[in-house]
Amino acid sequence: MSQLDALREMTVVVADTGDIEAIKQYQPQDATTNPSLILSASALPQYASLIDDAVAYAKARSDDKAQQLIDAEDKLAVNIGLEILKIVPGRISTEVDARLSYDTKATIEKARQIMKLYNDAGISNDRILIKIASTWQGIRAAEVLEKEGINCNLTLLFSQAQARACAEAGVYLISPFVGRILDWYKAAEKKEYAPAEDPGVISVTNIYNYYKQYGYQTVVMGASFRNVGEITEIAGCDRLTIAPPLLKELAESNAPLVRKLEYKGEVKTRPAPLTEAEFYWQHNQDPMAIEKLAEGIRKFAVDIEKLEAMLAAKL
């Protein structure tokens, strides 16, 4: 049995890509996209018609160029999501514009718009996750959306404070990042880490155990992997979203795979929810989390702007 098949027996495997061919090849349960993945997918020739459709949709809706860009961008992300939903049996994660990461109201409105585009295409809410950065404002937006039946995937999650606040808000799923945490520590400490000592692996392990310990239903989906060792060290996590090159490596390996994450203890009484002040105090104790959250939002914003430049040339 391949490591990928062994992993499927203990963890829901998700593909972290917008590439249809890769998704067909590895047959994941779900798929996740983000602005960077949408940007790289939009360069593939098979997506030309999806871009043309998004542009036509935007032109029909408005004469205002700025509004056309926003509409085309949303429609392209949904068009790619619709193609992926033809292949995966589960859910697609589609991300809210990262530039709205500190605006609760605008995030809620954008999430509703994305969901409406899916609904108009005949897709029900239970096949979509709306991806939102795990800022305090994003978490508050998700709390509102979850009550409306719009499930959310809180991403760019680097600190225990972010994870705790998401669970307390009743968020459907979180994506704690592994590889980007490793990147920070390698740069800061100037050293290499074995998978078991990997700070990203330790972070996800702690979050997983915290959620199970307090009986939170929020799904933990490890994300952002730099190597297969990081994946095998958190085998047993609720879900793992994995890029195609690492899915390939897992599929080609027959090395034994041992379940690493499994909580068997008692469920404890939950603490009182974090206040905004407590959230910021705890999150800001972690320089890695501060830097990586801000950097992640900036990087996604840059890729959204590149995507807009590509779309603007067609509008």
UniProtKB/Swiss-Prot annotation:
Localisation per UniProt entry: Cytoplasm
Main location: cytoplasm
Annotated active site: K131 (schiff-base intermediate with substrate)
Entry EC no(s): 2.2.1.2
GO annotation, cellular component aspect: cytosol
PROSITE patterns reported in the protein's UniProt record: TRANSALDOLASE_1 (PS01054), TRANSALDOLASE_2 (PS00958)
CDD domains, per database record: Transaldolase_TalAB
Involved pathway(s): Carbohydrate degradation; pentose phosphate pathway; D-glyceraldehyde 3-phosphate and beta-D-fructose 6-phosphate from D-ribose 5-phosphate and D-xylulose 5-phosphate (non-oxidative stage): step 2/3
GO molecular function, one term: transaldolase activity
UniProt keywords, alphabetically: Cytoplasm, Pentose shunt, Schiff base, Transferase
InterPro entries in the record: Aldolase_TIM, TAL/FSA, Transaldolase_1, Transaldolase_AS
GO BP term, example: pentose-phosphate shunt
The reaction(s) this protein catalyses: D-sedoheptulose 7-phosphate + D-glyceraldehyde 3-phosphate = D-erythrose 4-phosphate + beta-D-fructose 6-phosphate
Self-association and partners: Homodimer.
Entry function: Transaldolase is important for the balance of metabolites in the pentose-phosphate pathway.
Family of this protein: Belongs to the transaldolase family. Type 1 subfamily.
Protein name: Transaldolase
Organism: Actinobacillus pleuropneumoniae serotype 7 (strain AP76)
